[in-house]
Amino acid sequence: MALFPRSILIALVLSFVLNLGLVTKIHAKDTLDSIIDILSGLTCETQGVGDLMRTEFSHTCIVAPFFTFAVMNLVSPVLYMNTFLKLKINDSDLFNDSDFGNFPGGQCTRANRIDPKNPELRFALCNNAKLIVSRAKSVAESALAIAKAVLTWSDPWDDIKQAWENKKKEYHIPYRGKPGDDGFAFDVGFPVIYWKVIQDRDRICVSTKGFTGDVPVGCKYMKEPFPKSIYNSFIDVEDKNFIKDPTNDTPSDPLALVSCSAAGEGCYQKAYNASKTAVVMTSPLIECIKQMIARLLISKDVCSFDNVDQVVNLSSRQDSALFQFQVGMYKIVTAFLTLYVMFFGFKLLLAGKVPPKSEYINFILKIIFVTYFSIGININPANGSQYDRLDGMIQWAFPFLLNGINGLASWVMNAAPSGLCKFNNIHYDGSVSYIALWDALDCRVAHYLGLDILSTLLVENTYRSHDFLNFDFFSFSAPPYIYLLIPAIISGNMMLVSLALSYPLLVISVAAFMVNATIMCMISIVILGILAPLFVPMFLFAYTRNYFDSWVKLMISFLLQPMVVVTFMITMFAVYDYGFYGKCQYKSKLIHNSIEDKIQGGLKSKRDVLIFYINNDWDDTSQYPDKDSVESCKNSLGYMLNNPINMAFNFAKDNISEIVNSKPGETTTDEFLSKFQFLSGVVLGPGMFFMSPKVLFEKIKNILLALVTACFTLYLMYNFSSQLAEFAADMTEGVALNNVAIKPQAIFKAAMAALSTAGTATKGIDQMASRGGGARDLGGAKGFVSDNTASSGSAVGDNIAVSRGASTPTVTTTTDSSSITNSITKTVSSDVRSDIVTPHSPTTAFSQHSSISSTIPTSVHNIKPTSIKEIVSNNRESKKEINNTMRSQEKIKSASKALGLIDYSFNLKEHDNPIGVKQIRENAEIRDKRVEVEKAWNELVASGRGRIRDQQSEATSERRTNAEKKWKELVDSGVVTEIRERDNSVTNQFDKLADELDKSKKSKVEENKNITKDIKVDNTNTLPQEKVDNTNRRSGLIDYSFNLKEHDNPIGVKQIRENAEIRDKRVKVEKAWNELVASGGGRVQEQAGVKITERRANAEKVWDELVKSGVVTEKRDNSSNENS
């Protein structure tokens, strides 16, 4: 026995060497296949891995993803993998005889599926012990072949190839089993393998044990028909021969006849084929929602409430959410009924007299009602199955409520006086009869949006019987407001575009609200219906009766709300029709849609389309009972625009017929002339010099009246639609849907906002183009302006920045020749002054201000020639920089330390990355509120208020009172919060000094301090580039350039955010440069013996970081440094 493992090892090595030589010779072209073949021949496990990598799955007939294998290994570690690698089901080399099973073409073909009468599965398991014996036999045969070749000098490879043929039946053990059969397989390595045959719906599987029970490893499908088929959701209902063979006595599955379809004809295709309108939009959505509700409430095997009887007494109801809740509430409902019977019995015993018969009847009816609508009534008392029950919610309540939503709304939708989009007389199948409502809605929306223009022009004109003598072959249903787009596009006026699109956008908004409201009502009815076992038993007792009443009231409210919305839509459509089309009546014709046949490759389509067109048969008294109705239609704006050739032909025909048919002499002259309409239409109006055609003015008047009526209707409907959800809820005493459904004006407002944005962008582009042209014109005079400026000279004042933060203010003066520069300087100064917050001061302060101001003359040769184009460009950059200065909040913080002003914080915060129109609008509102706060604060401080401690004996003016009132409103509303913390280092000293001085001296100190502050703010608000250019001529400062550039016309949130970041970066550069210069740094040549303070070191560190990051670039080759 000790030599037995060694013999096995030697046999395996010889097998490996011989197999390598043989396989390499046979499969020399593919080395990878050779290696895999050798490895797959060693053990059953390696052979299973090789089959998994190179061929289709041999362990199963149903393909599964590799992720499934990983999950199953976690559920059943070791057992699943060992069974998985040894199991064989899909192997044509094995299953071709009586021992393993004879399956021509393979066990997994459609013809060889399992018979439901005899659900037996054939499979095999690989055995390592038999594999070793088979390999040893191959080694022995190979040795004999080699010996024979040595003795006979023949080629041994044919014999060796025959010896090493893969004889799978030698090392596989066949098994057969029906659902429930199990057993064990014993082998070398992992000694025991447990297997069990199970049935999973239409599959028979070989399983093994796992943590969750039986884990299927390999499966095979069963033939049709059989109960609980997974194919029943996509079997064609009309293909009865496929479902049931007349020669086969096997009963067909009732669920296989269900008209559901998840593959061939889904909910979308079913609704699309049943629809009769040209443009299908909403009916597929409603059909899919109805199928989802049926699957949720009844069973996942059905998709319509018409198929309820097919799942009675079947376990497929277990998948129903309502059924599961009913089973859970069974004992609770039984307890309620028991208490009700007990209380009724106590009432009989304690009453002392026999109650009337009506009370007995009421008692019995209540028990039946509660049982029927909560948990269902058992059909067969002898059968205790929980599936065999009559359920009132499934069989009566839900069909009534869900179909009632569409039925009531359909009655109103088809009540249009003009006959447009009436689908109630068209035949629909019983299961899809509700589509008539949504076809009417789609037809209306398509008609008012002009989506059916091509269908009317190409299809309708071909099929309906035209009177071509009236030249009506060029008729199309283009909405009248579409014609406003023509002048709007030509002129670029966005106001006309908004007017032209306002009504169709409102139609889309209200239609979207109707669809959304109907879906939300259906879902709400489903939710309330599932809770029926909880609320229906409350009907038994007076104490809980209110809960049941509220439940029923909500159900009825959700039933009626869509009808209210449809009534509003029909009113809006009717007023629109009358305003544009007068009393025109529509006719319809059901045609076959040959266009779809051509699109589908010539296949015959079952879909027919109902086309509506204006009835131009003026002799049809059923629709035009009097002459006024005919004239109203002919003179309407819509008819004239939709039938231009017909209108011109009718006008010419009427006039020519009167001329031709009339004979002079038969009537008086006045009667004869009255027949000529074109002559009676030419009259001399009062106040007119020329003869005016009266008929033309009549047409224009009718057109204007139609437009005014349409605009007035649009205004009324727009304002009423904002309260449509609340109105529908109040009418039905229910819950408003405006919080859970899209609002009726949502799409309208979003589209109008988009049009407004587009109009603003268009206007901005036009202004930019006009500005660019002006700049180019000014640039043409560059030589003249440069010479003029150079010859005239100017005196320029510089702002000199001194170390330690001190600055000497200067006043800029210019000569007459530099008037352009002077005007620009004044403009910038005025813009800066408007942002600075300072209290009022007496006029005497100007003498002190002038005393510290001085002019610095500058030689003419130091001024560079400047063109008007450069001046305009610099002016724009200056204004842009001024707009990017810090907010008033920051300026007041710096000023409050010196003036004792209270501080405040702005509490509203903008969205960092606004998404959608709503957040962008909120950001705009917050920015407007910030501007309002700044204005209120400036007015408060300018009026003498806003200090931590008020001055004594100071009169309160009306301006101050109003400013305080406005500021108090902002504080009370929570927009701002006052901060009255004081700066003890400066403010207390200032207050102490102010208390010691008299009133006149105190006012002068305040004025001097405010002037100093004005000069400081004025210096800090100028561009850093300008300050450097002015001061480097005096102090030898280095120059720099700001490298970031904003988008000229930012498009989208991303570019707007980038511009904001660049502006923030520019402010950071300004602060860093000012701090560097004020600390004594930033010079081209350092002064000897100057000590570098900590402030300067920090400033230089910040500035170096900005230079290294590429935000700014230093320029140290400035020629003006010679003057330092």
UniProtKB/Swiss-Prot annotation:
Q: Which family does it belong to?
A: Belongs to the TrbL/VirB6 family.
- Report the record's Gene Ontology biological process terms: protein secretion by the type IV secretion system
Where is this protein found?
Cell membrane
Q: Name one Pfam family in it.
A: TrbL
Q: Which superkingdom heads the taxonomic lineage of this protein's source?
A: Bacteria
UniProt keyword Transit peptide, yes or no: no
Q: Which InterPro entries match?
A: Conjugal_tfr_TrbL/VirB6
- Give the protein's recorded name: Uncharacterized protein RP104
Q: Which is a Gene Ontology cellular component entry for this protein?
A: plasma membrane
